Amino acid sequence: MESCARRCAVSGLTALSMRLTKQLSAAAASKAGAAGNLVFSPLSIYSVLSVVTAGARGRTLTELLGALGAESREKLAANAGEMARALPAPGGGAAQPGGGPRVAHACGVWHERTRTVRPAFRDAAAASFNAAALAVDFLNNPEEARKEINSWVAAATENLIDTILPPGSVSTDTGLVVTSAIYFNGQWWTPFCKEITEKRAFHRLDGGDVEADFMRSGEDQYIAVHDGFKVLKMPYAACVSARTTTTPRYSMYVFLPDERDGLWSLEDRMAAGGEGFLREHTPERRVEVGEFRIPRFKLSFDDSVVGALQRLGVRDVFKPFVADLADVLEAENSGDDPPLFVSDVKHKAVIEVNEEGTEAAAATAVCLTFASAAPSSRRPARVDFVADHPFAFLVLEESSGAVLFAGHVVDPTDE
């Protein structure tokens, strides 16, 4: 029953992850002139948007709830609470005895020290994602405040991400910054043997080939074969006490289209199907493999996600004098406070997948600025799974289905 409740609660996160994958892919391709690799953390972005939603009203609230897949602030808070119970609390990211994954997720609300956070907003942020309200001096020393926030992110991500706010990203007009950081480090349930990793051709979307390092295995694998694509589940090792269970706590899923140029159409299907697509296409049992190869890869992302969110219908919150975030800060005595709006949503993510397992981290920062400032099918007995062409991937927490990391690989040699 508890797992069912968590999966229902996480449906909005899953839908957001699928839709953001499509939007971020398109944005990256437009900027670079060609398709590129992608990694991001849906959970990190969902967390900060959920906290901001706790202070929104009117159409601003409606648009945020629509993107997050919730009917009301109360329902969103309940959903966030279910996810928080499935993930380690801040400070709970120590490695588990017996080799379980190390996972840590934390949120923070950094407000101008001369302003008071509304109690309802502070309590909602704390209840949903254990986000502590921390006072900093944006007004007199924004650079020092920026460094303090970056230090928090670096500590939360084991220094994989040392900076989320670049110089100039906060100013004397900054009223509040909401941050989220996540760290993951897990070894495979069945590690790959480095000695048999070999260089083979990986077929890119542009028709060219690159030589990549492919991990291989003769072990039975969790693979599901569907119309036009296959799905591979690679579980991470659980702690010793959990190894008798049939379902590992965390897994990576690889979605491999049959066609070498089939990544975009597959991602369209994933976006349209949302949480139901993942549930319906999850491998349920191990099968014997014939040829099995998957490349090592190391990816990173560093960009604003404002454009992607706007294309998902979140618009008013980014408009000065239009955004309604009146439930975030207490009004000053004068009663003529400049209103807040979101000037930027910065996101960074990194992931490395190799023979031992996966290490990944992500951070998101939402900058709330006073508007007086300028806005900135049937399974065969034996299956080949050769990921030698572009594929999509997810890292999931199994009991809730929460998507920690998502992305795709179009060239495993391009970091």
UniProtKB/Swiss-Prot annotation:
Residues at the site labelled Reactive bond: 371-372
Entry's free-text remark on domains: The reactive center loop (RCL) extends out from the body of the protein and directs binding to the target protease. The protease cleaves the serpin at the reactive site within the RCL, establishing a covalent linkage between the carboxyl group of the serpin reactive site and the serine hydroxyl of the protease. The resulting inactive serpin-protease complex is highly stable.
Family annotation (SUPFAM superfamilies): Serpins (SSF56574)
Cellular component GO terms held in the UniProt record: extracellular space
Job description of the protein: Probable serine protease inhibitor.
Cytoplasm as UniProt keyword: no
InterPro entries, per database record: Serpin_dom, Serpin_fam, Serpin_sf, Serpin_sf_1, Serpin_sf_2
Keywords: Protease inhibitor, Serine protease inhibitor
Region called RCL, residue ranges: 357-381
CDD domains in UniProt: serpinP_plants
Protein name: Putative serpin-Z6C
Naturally occurring in which organism (per UniProt): Oryza sativa subsp. japonica
Molecular-function GO term, any one: serine-type endopeptidase inhibitor activity
Family, per entry: Belongs to the serpin family.
